């Protein structure tokens, strides 16, 4: 057995380099530790066998890790529902709709091909984070003192999960409102291809040009991270060459989604989030809508215009989902391309619903999508700028002192608001690094204030 690197236990998941930081034995131990975690939760009933869903992505190491994970769960007495190879949102949907006690998916999301990992959820798709269980799992796994169970579990296979997920998404919109649109989608040889293929098979009026839809864990075309501009080059060229109306890009496990307009320009996630907020507020007037602390004021503007209540959230899917459940937020989105909905099946990413909602919206406008979107580009953004620091807390105190005459909030790092610019400085979860995001009403202010804040951080 390869020694387990304790650094693989992150804030939101378990993730590292396969064959270097961990091997198949970790998956076996994780299966047993996860059962132990659920057995000490308040909703556990010892008279009822735990039903745990398991799935994996298309990485080369994923099937073997999944097999060992199942072996660990069964050894600990659980009934395993094997969902096979599915996207992370499909996995969440299966756990939520079928009311399983929890689930684990083998995936390293958008990380390079050498990586792999595990995302864990409880009932309803509630994420297991560092604060809510990953530390417990880490201790159990590194201790490795599991007692054999008198009765082992069993494995059943469930194959219709994707169909159920897509049918639910299709039920959320009037499909007749979606007109003939030319769309190019790049799945980066990753799991988004599964739901994109199924979804567009129900939309014959749309002409889909698929790029990199064959599942391949070596990522032959490019990395599966649409946040990096170089990974969108092929998609943007194809949009222009095909004179398409819209482009769609998904990440490695399919839980993040980006949209490109007909001019080959990335539509800022803050605008997508604002448009989706407006659309969901038509379904649920006056609802609370979440947006993360990274500046994206157009979202707040659109939420207020549509009669919603904007609510700021921390960054990170686990934290946002917990806040959505606790404060009854209907929809939320992140600058990173995660878009969440709070439904009867759980609170998690529903990319197929987001696509359908936007297709309806873009079908109703009387102008090219790029022209339509440009009206919402009111603010100038610095983008996310990372800096290594000696002490994150010291930086936060310097920021608060230097900008004490601004409106200061601290839900995640330090957020400061002035009439003509606003920014957030927050820390990395895993290293001594801070991230600056700033927005302003004009480009000069954006550049000057970004430089001023970076100087304070670096001094």
Where are these regions (language model features)?
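Gly/Ser/Thr-enriched, mixed-charge loops and adjacent short helices
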Residues: 116-242
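Proline/glycine-rich low-complexity loops and linkers
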Residues: 135-167, 171, 262-335, 339-340
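An N-terminal, well-structured beta->alpha segment
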Residues: 1-71, 75-76, 155-182
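Glycine-rich phosphate-binding loop
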Residues: 101-115, 239-261, 266, 310-350
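Phosphate-binding and adjacent anionic-ligand microenvironments
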Residues: 284-459
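Gly/Ser/Thr-rich active-site loops/lids in small-molecule metabolic enzymes
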Residues: 127, 210-212, 265-284, 350-360
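N-terminal small/polar loop signature for handling phosphorylated ligands or for N-terminal nucleophile
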Residues: 40, 44-45, 51-116, 199-260
């Amino acid at each position: 057995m390869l020694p387990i690197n304790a650094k693989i236990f992150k804030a939101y998941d378990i993730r590292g380099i396969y064959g270097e930081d961990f091997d198949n034995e970790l998956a076996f131990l994780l299966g047993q530790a996860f059962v132990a975690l659920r057995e000490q939760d308040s909703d556990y009933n010892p008279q009822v066998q735990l039903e745990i869903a398991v799935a994996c992505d298309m990485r080369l190491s994923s099937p073997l890790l999944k097999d060992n994970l199942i072996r660990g769960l069964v050894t600990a007495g659980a009934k395993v529902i094997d969902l096979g190879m599915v996207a992370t949102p499909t996995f969440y949907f299966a756990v939520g709709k079928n009311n399983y006690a929890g689930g684990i998916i083998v995936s390293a999301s958008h990380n390079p091909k050498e990586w792999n990992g595990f995302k864990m959820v409880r009932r309803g798709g509630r994420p297991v984070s560092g604060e809510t269980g990953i530390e417990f799992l880490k201790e159990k796994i590194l201790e490795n003192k599991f007692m054999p169970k008198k009765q082992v579990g069993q494995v059943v296979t469930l194959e219709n999960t994707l169909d159920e997920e897509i049918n639910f998404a299709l039920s959320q919109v009037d499909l007749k409102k979606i007109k003939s649109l030319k769309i190019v989608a790049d799945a980066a040889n990753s799991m988004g291809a599964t739901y994109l293929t199924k979804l567009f098979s129900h939309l014959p009026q749309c002409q889909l040009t698929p790029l990199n839809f064959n599942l391949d864990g070596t990522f032959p075309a490019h990395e599966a991270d649409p946040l990096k501009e170089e990974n969108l080059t092929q998609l943007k060229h194809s949009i222009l060459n095909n004179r398409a109306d819209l482009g769609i890009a998904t990440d490695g496990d399919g839980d993040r989604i980006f949209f490109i307009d007909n001019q080959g320009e990335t539509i800022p996630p803050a605008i997508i989030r604002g448009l989706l907020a407006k659309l969901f507020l038509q379904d649920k007037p006056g609802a609370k809508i979440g947006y993360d602390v990274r500046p994206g004021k157009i979202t707040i503007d659109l939420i207020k215009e549509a009669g919603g209540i904007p609510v700021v959230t921390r960054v990170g899917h686990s934290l946002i989902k917990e806040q959505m459940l606790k404060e009854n937020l209907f929809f939320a989105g992140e600058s990173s391309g995660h878009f969440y909905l709070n439904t009867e099946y759980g609170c998690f990413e529903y990319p197929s619903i987001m696509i359908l909602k936007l297709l309806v919206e873009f079908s109703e406008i009387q102008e090219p999508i790029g022209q339509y979107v440009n009206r919402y580009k009111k603010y100038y953004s610095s983008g996310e700028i990372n800096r290594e620091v000696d002490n994150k807390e010291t930086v936060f105190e310097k920021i608060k002192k230097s900008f004490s005459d601004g409106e200061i909030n601290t839900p995640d790092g330090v957020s400061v608001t002035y009439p003509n610019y606003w920014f957030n400085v927050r820390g990395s979860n895993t290293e001594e690094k801070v991230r600056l995001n700033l927005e302003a009403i004009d480009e000069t202010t954006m550049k000057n204030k970004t430089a001023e804040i970076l100087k304070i951080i670096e001094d």
